[in-house]
Amino acid sequence: MNCDRICELPDSLLTQVLSYLPTIDSVKTSVLSKRWEFLWLRVPVLDLKVSDFPDENYASFIDNFLEFNRKSRMRKFKLKYDEYTYDDDRLAGWVVTTVDRGIQHLDAKGFETNMCVREFMPQNIYKCNTLVSLMLVTVGIENPEFVVSLPSLKIMHLEDVWYYDDPLIMEKIISGCPVLEDFVLIRPIDFCNLDVLQFLRVRSLSLRSFRLTFEYSVSCTYFSVEIDAPRLEYLNFNDDQSDTIVVKNMTSLSMIDIDSEFNVKFGGSRLEPGDLRKRDIIRDFLTAISCVRHMIISRRTLEVLDRYSKLVPIPKFDNLYRLQAAVSRSMLQLLLVFLESCPNLENLILDFTVSTEPEQDGLTYVPQCLLSSLECVEIRELIMGEETGEKLVRYFLKNSVVLKKLILRLEDSSIANQDSDIFKELSTFTKRSRSCEVIIIH
């Protein structure tokens, strides 16, 4: 589209186009012509990084923009601070103004100038009928003094956010979000021994996607998490600190990404035969997610399940058709034990790590899925010539009855021209499924 065609467009359409640009780029269009000089000021979006401004000119820029649009509704307000500039006094005021003007998308990213200082958001964010998405990073939120009402909020992302006054503040907020679908919560590291959601309760009838990250705590505080979301389809669970984990009503769960030690090793007690409480927590968690169809599981989670499986059997995952697991040479027997709990598995992806740990005993046991359902295996980060990796390849070729495809992703790109030698070596391996195709990817 040439310049003449663009100039024929109405102002309403041009401002809509400019709304997809960062404000600093939208301003640059003011030099195009007299018509464009103030057009950017009518864009209902303010998207800024303070690093784009010299000194503290960004503050007066925002004030002037909001003053010019005093009678206009705001669609989006996005402000990102950096380590050199952080205005503790103005952010909350700007949020008040934009919320009062019917903001739909609010994105505020603070910065830690002092590890134990946060600017707290105004309470009018709890009574915003128009807010659709809310992202808060490195700020604070207070206990609402009234019933939360966010009837339009569908997306909420809270990262490194401090919470004062009430350990159940998150339950109050979520209860006021009747259409919330996507929730990300990354708990802050409590260097200052402040409350960082000791009791996290996520109860929602609308939630479809939830990502929880809580990796590290320096205090000896007791933490617990409860998730009750019958419509949840995706769960990313990365929590190493909670002593109590309750997950229930996961009947809609389709995909889960687990990276957790269940407080078994780091910062917690080891899983011993007499530790019935911790064992039951793991059992109830696995049982609650047993309807899942697609699972990604980390190496350290598998290591915890190795201990668990020596005490009681791992629950069955009858619906699981796709599994991605991180394994090393010392975990191959554990992998087979876990695969036995996946009787209908069709696709298996292994992120293989060559470690210095001793290799476990030979691969002799054959899980049910290899005999009846497993159609595709992908092994990543393989090093040709490495003994354990080759054993793994031999094992799947020898024991997979209905295998259609074996994909080998090689780590060493220096052997890219040696495919013929690799295929020649693979041709000596016993192949249970005659229709199996071996694919090598560098």
Curated annotation (Swiss-Prot):
Q: What is the official name of this protein in its record?
A: F-box/FBD/LRR-repeat protein At2g26030
Ranges for domain F-box come to: 3-49
Stretches assigned to the FBD domain: 358-410
Outline the LRR repeats, range by range. Answer: 128-160, 162-187, 188-214, 234-260, 278-309, 324-352
Xref: InterPro entries: F-box-like_dom_sf, F-box_AtFBL13-like, F-box_dom, FBD, FBL13/AtMIF1-like, LRR_dom_sf, LRR_FXL15/At3g58940/PEG3-like
CDD domains in the record:
F-box_AtFBL13-like (cd22160)
Taxonomy, top ranks, is: Eukaryota, Viridiplantae, Streptophyta, Embryophyta, Tracheophyta
Q: Which UniProt keywords apply?
A: Leucine-rich repeat, Repeat
